[in-house]
A protein has these predicted regions:
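Helix-to-loop junction immediately C-terminal to a conserved catalytic motif
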Residues: 65-97
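Residue-level signal for beta-strand positions within conserved beta-sheet cores that form or flank
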Residues: 72, 116-118, 242-244
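Catalytic core of membrane glycerolipid acyltransferases/transacylases, capturing the structured
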Residues: 86-160
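Short, flexible loop segments at the rims of nucleotide/cofactor-binding pockets, characterized by
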Residues: 52, 67-73, 158-163, 196-198
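Non-catalytic C-terminal accessory region of glycerolipid acyltransferases
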Residues: 2-37, 41-42, 161-290
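A transmembrane-helix-recognition feature enriched in membrane-embedded lipid enzymes
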Residues: 23-77, 105-108, 112, 133-145
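Hydrophobic helix-cap positions at the C-terminus of alpha-helices
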Residues: 82-85, 113, 174-178
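A generic local structural motif
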Residues: 61-62, 76-81, 110, 168-170, ...
Length: 290
C-alpha cells in the first residue's frame, strides 16, 4: 500500500503513505443522515493535524483522568514488550473483553508508561457511537474520537453491512501502514459477562482476516479487575476495589498462518491462536492473583 518515492541523505527510503480511504457512494448511502454525519466527523478527526490534536488530548488529559481513577489499583506487566516494537510498523493489541473501559485503561497505560510515538484506533460498533449525537460526545470524551472505524453489525439493519466493506478496507490500511499506529481489538467481538475472569469467548474470524491481510506486529493483552460501573470503579480506587491487572505479552509470530491460503478457515485459526495467547497471559495472572 506504500511506495518508496525518494531517499534521505542516509540512503534510507522515505515511505509515503497512501491517501486515507473513503467510502464509495453506495457504501455511505446505506447509513442514516445522523450516521453519515457521525462518520464524517470522526473520519476527519482521525486525519492530519486533527488526529495529532486528539492524540495530544489523549496523552495529557484523557490518560490523566483514567490514571487518577485507577492508580491505587493498577498493576502492569510486560510493558517493555510494547516499548521494543518497531514504531514504523503498525502494532495491533488483541485483548480479552470484560469491561467497557478495557481499551481506555490500556491506552492510559501506554501513554503514561511508554515514550513510544502512537496514534490509537479502536474499531467499534456503529450502534450508539455513530447513530446518536450523545455517542459522538462519548467518543470525544472517552476516546478523543479514536473509536474508529465503525462497524454496523445489528441483525435488524443488515443492509448497513454494505458500509462495513469500507470499514474493513480502512482497518486493513491502518494496520498496514502508519508510523505509531496502534490498533486495539477484542477478538471475542463482544463483552464476556461470565463471573469467571479467566473464561474467554470464541474468537471471531474478522480479526484474523485483518491481520492476515495487513501483517502488522501483534501483541496479546490480558485484562482483569475492571468493572462496568464507572462510579463504583472510581470509588474503588480509594476504598480497596479489585486490583486491576494488565498483562502485555511478547509479539506473536504468525508466519505459519501467512503461508496458508487466504480463506475463512485460515482467518479463524489465526483468531483462535490469538485468543490462546491471551489465555496464556490469563494463566499467569491466575498463578499470581487467583
Amino acid at each position: 500500500m506504500t511506495e518508496e518515492l525518494t531517499k534521505t541523505t542516509e540512503n534510507k527510503p522515505i515511505v509515503i503513505q497512501a491517501a486515507p480511504l473513503v467510502p464509495a457512494p453506495d457504501e455511505i448511502g446505506v447509513l442514516s443522515r445522523t450516521e453519515r454525519a457521525g462518520f464524517w466527523l470522526t473520519h476527519r478527526m482521525n486525519l492530519g493535524i486533527a488526529k495529532r490534536l486528539m492524540t495530544f488530548g489523549q496523552r495529557h488529559i484523557g490518560s490523566l483522568w483514567i490514571y487518577l481513577a485507577t492508580y491505587n489499583l493498577m498493576n502492569v506487566f510486560g510493558i517493555e514488550n510494547v516499548e521494543t516494537t518497531d514504531v514504523d510498523t503498525p502494532l495491533v493489541l488483541v485483548a480479552n473483553h470484560r469491561s467497557f473501559f478495557d481499551m481506555y485503561t490500556v491506552s492510559s497505560v501506554l501513554f503514561r508508561r511508554t515514550m513510544r510515538p502512537m496514534e490509537l484506533y479502536f474499531p467499534v460498533r456503529g450502534k450508539f457511537f455513530y447513530d446518536n449525537p450523545l455517542g459522538w460526545f462519548v467518543n470525544l470524551v472517552m476516546g478523543w474520537f479514536s473509536m474508529f472505524p465503525p462497524f454496523f453489525r445489528e441483525a435488524r439493519e443488515a443492509r448497513k453491512r454494505e458500509f462495513d466493506k469500507f470499514s474493513m478496507r480502512r482497518l486493513v490500511q491502518l494496520c498496514s501502514e502508519g508510523r505509531g499506529h496502534i490498533i486495539g481489538f477484542h477478538p471475542e467481538g463482544k463483552r464476556n459477562f461470565s463471573d469467571d475472569p479467566y473464561s474467554i469467548l470464541p474468537a471471531q474470524p474478522g480479526i484474523g482476516k485483518v491481520i492476515y491481510s495487513a501483517h502488522p506486529q501483534v501483541i496479546p493483552v490480558f485484562i482483569a479487575g475492571l468493572g462496568n460501573d464507572l462510579p463504583k470503579q472510581i470509588l474503588g480506587n480509594w476504598t480497596g476495589g479489585p486490583k486491576i491487572r494488565i498483562w502485555f505479552g511478547e509479539p506473536i509470530e504468525l508466519q505459519e498462518f501467512y503461508e496458508k491460503g487466504d480463506r475463512l478457515r485460515t482467518h479463524k485459526e489465526l483468531s483462535d491462536h490469538l485468543m490462546a495467547k491471551i489465555a496464556e497471559l490469563g494463566e499467569k495472572d491466575r498463578e499470581k492473583f487467583g
